[in-house]
Amino acid sequence: MELNSLLILLEAAEYLERRDREAEHGYASVLPFDGDFAREKTKAAGLVRKAPNNRSSHNELEKHRRAKLRLYLEQLKQLVPLGPDSTRHTTLSLLKRAKVHIKKLEEQDRRALSIKEQLQQEHRFLKRRLEQLSVQSVERVRTDSTGSAVSTDDSEQEVDIEGMEFGPGELDSVGSSSDADDHYSLQSGTGGDSGFGPHCRRLGRPALS
């Protein structure tokens, strides 16, 4: 596009110079002076003088762009799987393969995100379950400790009863009660062994003559 514009400007400048030469030699009538026309003529002449410089700079830019494009294509060859005949691929085939490869990567990315979400849900569920089990374990420990405390109190009460000290009167009553129980047991055992009732023990021995 820029090259076409430069060619048009060059043709316009040559036309203006040709008209000027014809006017100087009397081949054509000179137009009345116009300031705008003069400014356009000066501008066109400046563009003609700058045209070679613009063309060279344009060539440099184009060369730089092509070199950068080749570099990008080489980098793309390293990223896209091309197969054994990678040297025979054209730029168009390389771009098509790159497009297919990008779609595969996007599909893999979607699957990976789905798996990641599932794992996060499982992690949250397991975390809540662990918290519930921890609470139940603490409650069970509290229940066991309460039961052991009650058992300890009962055993302490038994020990206190066994180690209780009695006064003289209380000891006599306990002893008499124990003696009465022993006497009743003895009578029962004697009567059972000899075949006589409890009244037989009241008979004294006969007096000797």
From Swiss-Prot:
Record region (Disordered): 140-209
Known partners and oligomeric status: Efficient DNA binding requires dimerization with another bHLH protein. Binds DNA as a heterodimer with MAX. Interacts with SIN3A AND SIN3B. Interacts with RNF17.
Domain called bHLH: residue spans: 53-105
PROSITE patterns, alphabetized: BHLH
Keyword annotations from UniProtKB, A to Z: DNA-binding, Nucleus, Repressor, Transcription, Transcription regulation
PANTHER family: MAX DIMERIZATION PROTEIN 4 (PTHR11969:SF4), MAX DIMERIZATION, MAD (PTHR11969)
GO molecular function, one term: DNA-binding transcription factor activity, RNA polymerase II-specific
Name of this chain's protein: Max dimerization protein 4
Coiled coil stretches, renumbered: none
